């Protein structure tokens, strides 16, 4: 346990005392800490293990160049690129087992950019004054743990010592984990998307895949989830996909918070990864709102509240045609090994018959548009069932298993 190394990222010109304390705490636990300096203007307040000149050189510049015109917008990309290169080289030699960064607004931004470029599974912690708010820009789709600093990270005192010590212990503790992101068998790892309104179906699918000997990674399809799944495809960690929840596309088209960006639904086709698709959750979008307040522009829409602050309007026939158009466009690069299963009795529990968002006209418009627009490389099957029905899920699982066989 004493051979684990934590790289500590900090601006040592302003956070030298705190960085030295963190290094001391990790050493006291039996670990090894390396201080990586991303500070530019002043002299380091403690001796770095990886000095700023080395980081800058690895980022494609020189200390002299940056000091001649010390601008944050010029220095940050260089430090970020240099730190990424250094840490990735260390990872290749099994010389780093966790990364801990800390800072205020700029330090947090730089640490986050570095960690977002590091592989899934490597422990990553940011102790930040920015962690009590919207952290999505810092975490993005990576397994980054953010910890609120409470006070400014400026000097040691009873509070900061305690919190810095906790962060150091957390990083050291994570470094001890024996698990690595790797396949446990020769069989494909299956990626699957899910939403709360089709979870019963997702659980049944997962059970069936496991019984067939496959491991499944399930992603909550609310934006970051779909993007994370596709990044793991690119990195080779996922070899087959049951894309059960395509609601992220609806939010992309109509301005909901679940949008996963323009690349969503293009990756599996380009990589040739076997995929079975279901438009789960496409019939609605998710919008944040004041508690139980219907947004003015959706007064005429059939709707429900998923919870007090998440408003869920039912997309009408024209809205659904637009969603079908985008889904079809994004599957144009698919070269085969892809099937779209259409659940004719409802794309989620919200829109089955007698449910609050049931709209047979909108569903028909959607399904007809998909059948008209989907490329010939995507097989289309109409299933007389709802997306959560066991018969639908079993057909989907069987289809993907047949592709893998």
Regions found by a protein language model. Name each.
Residues 11-17, 97-111, 191-202, 222-224, ...:
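Gly/Ser/Thr-rich loops at beta-strand to alpha-helix junctions
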Residues 1-43, 98, 107-117, 121-126:
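N-terminal phosphate-binding or glycine-rich loops at protein starts, especially the Walker A/P-loop
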Residues 98, 110-139, 148, 217-221, ...:
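Short, acidic/small-residue loops that bind anionic groups at enzyme active sites
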Residues 5-7, 14-34, 256-405:
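C-terminal non-catalytic interaction/assembly regions of soluble proteins
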Residues 47-95:
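Phosphate/nucleotide-donor binding subsite
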Residues 67-68, 134-197, 322, 382:
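Cap/lid and interdomain-hinge subdomains that line or gate substrate/regulatory clefts
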């Amino acid at each position: 346990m004493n051979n684990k190394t934590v790289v500590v990222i900090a601006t040592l010109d302003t956070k030298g005392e705190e960085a030295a304390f963190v290094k001391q705490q990790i050493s006291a636990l039996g670990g090894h800490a390396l201080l990586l300096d991303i500070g530019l203007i002043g002299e380091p307040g403690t001796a770095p293990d990886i000095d700023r000149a080395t980081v800058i050189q690895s980022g494609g510049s020189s200390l002299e160049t940056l000091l001649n015109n010390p601008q944050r917008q010029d220095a940050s990309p260089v430090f970020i690129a240099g730190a990424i290169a250094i840490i990735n080289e260390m990872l290749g030699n099994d010389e780093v087992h966790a990364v801990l960064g800390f800072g205020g607004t700029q330090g947090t931004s730089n640490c986050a950019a570095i960690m977002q470029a590091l592989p899934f599974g490597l422990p990553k912690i940011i102790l930040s004054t920015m962690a009590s708010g919207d952290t999505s820009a810092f975490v993005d789709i990576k397994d980054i743990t953010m910890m609120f600093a409470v006070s400014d990270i400026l000097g040691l005192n009873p509070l900061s010592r305690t919190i810095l010590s906790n962060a150091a212990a957390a990083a050291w503790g994570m470094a001890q984990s024996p698990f690595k992101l790797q396949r446990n068998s020769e069989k494909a790892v299956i990626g699957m998307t899910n939403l709360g309104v089709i979870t019963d179906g997702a659980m049944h699918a997962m059970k069936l895949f496991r019984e067939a000997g496959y491991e499944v990674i399930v992603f909550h399809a609310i934006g970051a989830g779909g993007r994370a799944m596709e990044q793991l495809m690119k990195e080779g960690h996922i070899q087959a996909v049951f894309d059960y929840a395509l609601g992220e596309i609806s939010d992309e088209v109509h301005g909901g918070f679940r949008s996963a960006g323009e690349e969503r639904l293009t990756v599996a086709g380009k990589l040739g990864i076997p995929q079975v698709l279901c438009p789960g959750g496409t019939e609605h979008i998710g919008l944040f709102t004041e508690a139980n307040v219907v947004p003015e522009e959706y007064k005429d829409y059939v709707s429900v509240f998923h919870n007090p602050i998440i408003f869920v309007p039912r997309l009408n026939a024209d809205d659904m045609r637009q969603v079908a158009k985008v889904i079809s466009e994004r599957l144009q690069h698919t070269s085969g090994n892809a099937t779209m299963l259409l659940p004719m009795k409802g794309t989620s529990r919200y829109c089955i018959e007698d449910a609050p968002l049931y709209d047979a006209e909108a569903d028909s418009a959607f399904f007809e548009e998909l059948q008209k627009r989907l490329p010939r490389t995507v097989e289309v099957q109409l299933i007389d069932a709802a997306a959560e029905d066991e018969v639908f899920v079993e057909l989907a699982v069987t289809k993907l298993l047949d592709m893998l066989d």
